[in-house]
Curated annotation (Swiss-Prot):
Gene responsible for this protein: ANKDD1A
Disulphide linkage map: none
PROSITE patterns: ANK_REP_REGION, ANK_REPEAT, DEATH_DOMAIN
Residues of the Death domain: 413-501
Name of the protein this chain belongs to: Ankyrin repeat and death domain-containing protein 1A
Residue spans of the ANK repeats: 14-43, 47-76, 90-119, 123-152, 158-187, 191-220, 224-253, 257-286, 290-319, 323-352, 356-385
PANTHER family linked to this entry: ANKYRIN REPEAT AND PROTEIN KINASE DOMAIN-CONTAINING PROTEIN, DEATH DOMAIN-CONTAINING PROTEIN
A Gene Ontology biological process term: signal transduction
Pfam families associated with the record: Ank, Ank_2
Gene3D superfamilies linked: Ankyrin repeat-containing domain, Death Domain, Fas
Transmembrane region(s): none
InterPro entries registered for this protein in UniProt: Ankyrin_rpt, Ankyrin_rpt-contain_sf, DEATH-like_dom_sf, Death_dom
CDD domains: Death
Length: 522
């Protein structure tokens, strides 16, 4: 519900609508005029509300008294029968509305007029629930001190007491009043949540601190096995997470499904919460009931910043879930290029296969994610080269993503002319094999179909992949290209190669490396 009732007048006759409006605005003179014309004081709009609801919800004492004097039914609820629209109605009567909005004097008038004090909304909210949720301490005091047989720990349809409601909605003063009145601190709702779970999940620091001070059990689990720390992590509340950790919460507590607090932080994408948990000793490599690590979840839900944090925190990039999928398999399946680049730079094993026997490269091919296919091939070629050159300095800023920058346009144009005008349909593959592309690499490139001239695109992609490797190795691209063409028997292209050499050589090997390998973001 909102801080005031949403104005609804459908389903009313014109004069009835005017009565509702006058009650809402406390226009007693107009109300008396309309009542004198025998306008029905019990007329309902299309969501079941009567004039008394508007007057009580707005705290208009004169309007309430006038309506009660003219046959307004004190206990009428909205959302009655066929009029019910769950989106708009809550099964609230005037008494509950006065408690909800904190109008103590209206509450007293209605009680003195015979309103039933043990009423409930359709969600099972009592007067105590309404006042506690909205933090109206004077109303709470009246209910507890002046009304008879009020059950302090009565539960609503979710199994929550007024104490739960105050905690869930951050009402510290109301919470203190209920504690002082002797409420049960440890009661659980139907999902097994304590007040600690609810306050932590909503991020209410002051209430959470008070509950910790009261002595609620930090390790109490709900029906799914979540502790309050899980709730705070899942709600992306780093301050609450820190508070609970300082109070002694177990950072690596597991739910029934083996989910850690770090899993919940990963599901919500919270880098801040994850960092707090990791610094407190949270294990980055624990797996849930499906074999998924926090890194798997961060990849699946496309949280690049969190993926970077987890990788830097020694998460196992080669961990496999119950489907034998690594995080890279997931990135390949969804075409998350930024995340795939991080995993490739981290050195993920490209030979691991899922339950269908597919590598991450095969998954990318099956999903027709061309750019990601090329990234994986670049990475595979780089790590093969690196294995054979262990003494080479590794001070290169790696990236395997496709480069679209203006600085590389000339180079890419040269290679496109070669692929589209000079190489015959099968020659790009001969050139690829001469440069030690594997059969799997060639097959992966060839899966793309753009028509009868697909070979031109295949050749262009292969040349760009090759150029990435040449740049990374610090080799002379013009020399390597010339030697490759000679190796496949295309010495006749020497003239073209010589022409292109001036364009390629104009950019030194070191310059090629710099512009082909984008710098990582700061």
């Amino acid at each position: 519900m909102q801080e005031e009732l949403a104005w609804e007048t459908d389903g009313l006759l014109p004069l009835e609508r005017q009565l509702h409006e006058a009650a809402r605005q406390n226009n007693v003179g107009r109300m008396q005029e309309l009542i004198g014309r025998r306008v029905n004081t019990r007329a309902r709009n299309h969501v079941g509300r009567v004039a008394l609801h508007w007057a009580a919800g707005a705290g208009h004492e004169q309007a309430v008294r006038l309506l009660l004097e003219h046959e307004a039914a004190v206990d009428e609820e909205d959302a009655v029968g066929a009029l019910t629209e769950a989106r708009l109605c809550f099964g609230m009567n005037a008494l509950l509305l006065s408690a909800w909005f904190g109008h103590l004097r209206i509450l007293q008038i209605l009680v003195n007029s015979g309103a039933k004090i043990h009423c409930e909304s359709k969600d099972g909210l009592t007067l105590l629930h309404c006042a506690a949720q909205k933090g109206h301490v004077p109303v709470l005091a009246f209910i507890m001190e002046d009304l008879e047989d009020v059950a302090l720990d009565h539960v609503d349809k979710l199994g929550r007491t007024a104490f739960h409601r105050a905690a869930e909605h951050g009402q510290l003063d109301a919470l203190d009043f209920l504690v002082g009145s002797g409420c049960d601190h440890n009661v659980k709702d139907k999902e097994g949540n304590t007040a600690l779970h609810l306050a932590a999940g909503r991020g209410h620091m002051a209430v959470l601190q008070r509950l910790v001070d009261i002595g609620l059990d930090l390790e109490e689990q709900n029906a799914e096995g979540l502790t309050a720390l899980h709730s705070a992590a899942g709600g992306s509340h780093p301050d609450c997470v820190q508070l609970l950790l300082r109070a002694g919460s177990t950072v690596n507590a597991l739910t029934q499904k083996n989910l850690s607090c770090l899993h919940y932080a990963a599901l919500s994408g919270s880098e801040d919460v994850s960092r707090v948990l990791i610094h407190a000793g949270g294990c980055a490599n624990v797996v849930d009931h499906q074999g998924a690590s926090p890194l798997h979840l961060a990849v699946r839900h496309n949280f690049p910043a969190l993926v970077r944090l987890l990788i830097n925190s020694d998460s196992d990039v080669n961990a496999v879930d119950n489907r034998q999928q690594t995080p890279l398999h997931l990135a390949a399946e969804h075409a998350w290029q930024d995340i795939a680049d991080m995993l490739l730079i981290a050195g993920v094993d490209l030979n691991l296969r899922d339950k269908q026997g597919k590598t991450a490269l095969a998954v990318a091919v099956r999903s027709n994610h061309v750019s990601l296919v090329d990234m994986i091939i670049k990475a595979d070629r780089f790590y093969r080269w690196e294995k054979d050159h262990p003494s080479d300095p590794s001070g290169k800023s790696l990236s395997f993503k496709q480069d679209h920058r203006q600085e590389t346009q000339q180079l890419r144009s040269v290679l496109w002319r070669l692929a589209s005008r000079y190489l015959q349909p099968r020659e790009w593959k001969k050139l690829a094999y001469s440069w030690e592309f594997t059969e799997a690499h060639v097959d992966a490139i060839e899966q793309q179909w753009t028509g009868t001239r697909s070979y031109q695109e295949h050749g262009h992609r292969m040349l760009l992949i090759w150029l990435h490797g040449v740049a990374t190795a610090g080799e002379n691209p013009s020399k390597a290209l010339f030697e490759g063409l000679v190796a496949i028997g295309r010495r006749d292209l020497a003239g073209w190669s010589t022409m292109a050499r001036s364009q390629l050589t104009a950019t030194s090997a070191s310059r090629v490396q710099m512009i082909l390998v984008p710098q990582p973001p700061e």
